[in-house]
From Swiss-Prot:
Its main location: endoplasmic reticulum. Gene3D superfamilies: Glycogen Phosphorylase B. Keywords: Endoplasmic reticulum, Membrane, Nucleus, Transmembrane, Transmembrane helix. One of its GO terms (biological process) is dolichol-linked oligosaccharide biosynthetic process. Belongs to the ALG14 family. Residues 32-232 are cytoplasmic. Involved in protein N-glycosylation. Essential for the second step of the dolichol-linked oligosaccharide pathway. Anchors the catalytic subunit ALG13 to the ER. Residues 1-10 are lumenal. It is a single-pass membrane protein. GO terms for molecular function: N-acetylglucosaminyldiphosphodolichol N-acetylglucosaminyltransferase activity. It comes from Debaryomyces hansenii (strain ATCC 36239 / CBS 767 / BCRC 21394 / JCM 1990 / NBRC 0083 / IGC 2968). This is UDP-N-acetylglucosamine transferase subunit ALG14.
Length: 232
């Protein structure tokens, strides 16, 4: 075999893994496969619970106003038929109390159970960029560790920010890419975001199966966004 033929074979073998990875990424990436929704797909809040089908739902509570919005949204969703995994950030004892109160007041005891995970916070308010990089790495490690310890991966990941939700969402997406889970990622943008998405929303938008906004102009601007009115 001459030199040119050997070189061509080596180049093909070198590029083949990248080609396969690219095809796989296109196959699983919702931003490529999901149709644009836009503001014309308004079907009402009742359409949201239709996605919550599966044996386990993981709910991320982002602390402060994010937790408050999520709990008000969940007031319209019946979670009795699902195992529930509540995820909070380190130092956020208030969110833990709120989800436990939700469990006590709204959910009936039975065969479905609830678990609680505490992840290292990706970034604190006022933290420098350099410090936040290390915090994000610690958050990634913490997230991988806790997900590895789960008896099963969630069927649904429901989140609405802020920063700590990004490592969680991307690790779940990586597991989907590797074929280890089929988790559907649903992100609900904060009511405070009227004209622009949050940084967390922009980062998570490409990998979400559903991206829900609460202002119509956002659904017009971002074609994969779904609009059902104000949810809280």
């Amino acid at each position: 075999m001459d030199f040119e033929s050997q070189l061509c074979i080596k180049v093909v073998l070198l590029l083949l893994p990248f080609f396969i990875i690219g095809i796989r990424l296109l196959w699983v990436l919702p931003a490529v496969n999901s149709p644009a929704m836009g503001s014309e797909k308004e079907k009402g809040l009742s359409q949201i619970p239709s996605e919550l089908r599966g044996s386990n739902i993981m709910i991320f509570l982002g602390s402060g106003g994010h937790t408050g919005e999520m709990m008000r949204i969940l007031a319209n969703v019946d979670l009795n038929n699902f195992n529930r995994t509540w995820v909070t950030s380190s130092g956020d004892s208030t969110s833990i109390l709120k989800c436990k109160k939700y469990e006590d007041e709204r959910l009936t005891s039975g065969q479905n159970k609830s678990d609680y995970l505490v992840l290292h916070r990706a970034r604190t308010v006022g933290e420098s960029i350099i410090s936040s990089v290390f915090s994000t790495v610690r958050s990634l490690i913490s997230t991988i560790k806790h997900l590895y310890e789960l008896p099963q991966f969630p069927s649904i990941l429901l989140l609405n920010g802020p920063g700590t939700s990004v490592p969680l969402a991307y690790i779940i997406f990586l597991l989907k890419f590797l074929g280890l889970c089929k988790t559907r990622i649903i992100y609900i943008e904060s009511l405070a975001r009227v004209k622009q998405l949050s940084v967390s929303g922009l980062l998570i938008l490409p990998i979400t199966d559903r991206f829900i906004v609460q202002w119509k102009q956002l659904a017009v601007k971002y074609k994969r966004a779904e609009y059902y009115g104000i949810l809280i």
